[in-house]
Curated annotation (Swiss-Prot):
Pfam families assigned to the protein according to its UniProt record, in alphabetical order: Prenyltransf
EC primary class: transferase
Active site location: 76, 124 (proton acceptor)
Subunit structure: Homodimer.
Name of the protein: Decaprenyl diphosphate synthase
CDD domains: Cis_IPPS (cd00475)
EC number: 2.5.1.86, 2.5.1.87
Keyword Transcription: no
Cofactor(s) for this UniProt protein: Mg(2+); Mn(2+)
Gene name linked to the record: uppS
Organism, scientific name: Mycobacterium tuberculosis (strain ATCC 25618 / H37Rv)
Location of the protein in the cell: Cell membrane
Function as written in the Swiss-Prot or TrEMBL entry: Catalyzes the sequential condensation of isopentenyl diphosphate (IPP) in the cis configuration with (2Z,6E)-farnesyl diphosphate (Z-FPP or EZ-FPP) generating the 50 carbon product trans,polycis-decaprenyl diphosphate. When (2E,6E)-farnesyl diphosphate (E-FPP or EE-FPP) is used in vitro, both primary products decaprenyl diphosphate and (2E,6E,10E)-geranylgeranyl diphosphate (EEE-GGPP) are synthesized. M.tuberculosis does not synthesize (2E,6E,10Z)-geranylgeranyl diphosphate (EEZ-GGPP) and heptaprenyl diphosphate.
GO MF term list: all-trans-nonaprenyl-diphosphate synthase (geranyl-diphosphate specific) activity; ditrans,polycis-undecaprenyl-diphosphate synthase [(2E,6E)-farnesyl-diphosphate specific] activity; magnesium ion binding; manganese ion binding; Z-farnesyl diphosphate synthase activity
Cofactor annotation comment: Binds 2 magnesium ions per subunit. Can also use manganese as divalent cation, however calcium and zinc ions are much less effective.
Length: 296
């Protein structure tokens, strides 16, 4: 691998340069679990370049000042994808696993620095006990199965969500992945499990109320910044681009505080059919928009 293989093309265009034609491509996603290709060792112990898309398409050139810094995705459509094929809903979730890794690769190629993925919401506990049990075990196993690969790519993995009801084994695997990747800085992936925007704001409000009751905080001095500091991950930047797959047009209680001024793009593909080229297309549309943040 050339010394400058991961070097960005320009400070104004943060995309990775096109990969060499013989560089590994993302694996066939028709079987599960997908076997990730062996990547050439990175020079000087740095992160590996992601495998290129099977089409060998390169990330579009988008200037840094037009590129979303933080993309949040509601990964919707796994169940419908399976139902359309006469399969159990769990099969759709399985096929969505490879898409998560492909999207991470595409985000790295494009130069996105923050990616938040809605893996399990606080409302998903309402699903059948069988599906909930599957999703708990599945999320635990996905993190365990993919953390080494993501570490090699320079991904920092973090869990965002609430502890009540969440399986201890899931929390443990997320903690291991977070510790393993804490020094990585290519991209941060917030893996949101047992997450709800209203729950997050409620928890922040409860903690602020405790501080007021203890005399540590003057209620007259509470500001938006006060609330932001008490969110589950205070350092998460505001969402720039909010994506939802499957054609549904709603936020489903995801990143309510952080996405206050996000650009929303709803894409029709079901999550198992989605790939990095769809992410790139959404980012190109984002780049064409004018963000006013309430101004004229």
């Amino acid at each position: 691998m050339a010394r400058d293989a991961r070097k960005r093309t320009s400070s104004n265009f943060p995309q990775l340069p096109p990969a060499p034609d013989d560089y590994p491509t993302f694996p066939d996603t028709s079987t599960w679990p997908v076997v990730f290709p062996e990547l050439p060792a990175a020079p000087y112990g740095g992160p590996c370049r992601p495998p290129q898309h099977t089409s060998k398409a390169a990330a579009p050139r988008i200037p840094a000042d037009r590129l979303p810094n933080h993309v949040a995705i509601v990964m919707d459509g796994n169940g419908r994808w399976a139902t359309q094929r006469g399969l159990a809903r769990t099969e759709g979730h399985k096929m969505g696993e490879a898409v998560v890794i492909d999207i991470a690769c595409g985000a790295i190629e494009l130069g996105i620095k923050w990616l938040s993925l809605y893996a399990f919401s606080t409302e998903n506990w309402k699903r059948s006990p069988e599906e909930v049990r599957f999703l708990m075990g599945f999320n635990r196993d996905v993190v365990r199965r993919r953390r080494d690969t993501l570490k090699k790519l320079g991904v920092r993995i973090r869990w965002v969500g609430s502890r009540p009801r969440l399986w201890r084994s899931v929390i443990n695997e997320l903690a291991v992945a977070e510790e393993m990747t804490k020094s990585n800085d290519v991209i941060t992936i917030n893996y949101c499990v047992n997450y709800g925007g209203r729950t997050e704001i409620t928890e922040a409000t409860r903690e602020i109320a405790r501080e007021v009751a203890a005399g540590r905080l003057n209620p007259e001095r509470i500001t938006e910044s006060t609330i932001a500091r008490h969110l589950q991950r205070p350092d998460i930047p505001d969402v720039d681009l909010f994506l939802r797959t499957s054609g549904e047009q709603r936020s489903s209680n995801f990143m309510l505080w952080q996405a206050a001024y996000a650009e929303y793009i709803f894409q029709d593909k079901l999550w198992p059919d989605y790939d990095r080229r769809d992410l790139w297309a959404a980012c190109e549309e984002y780049a064409s928009r004018t963000r006013r943040f309430g101004s004229a």
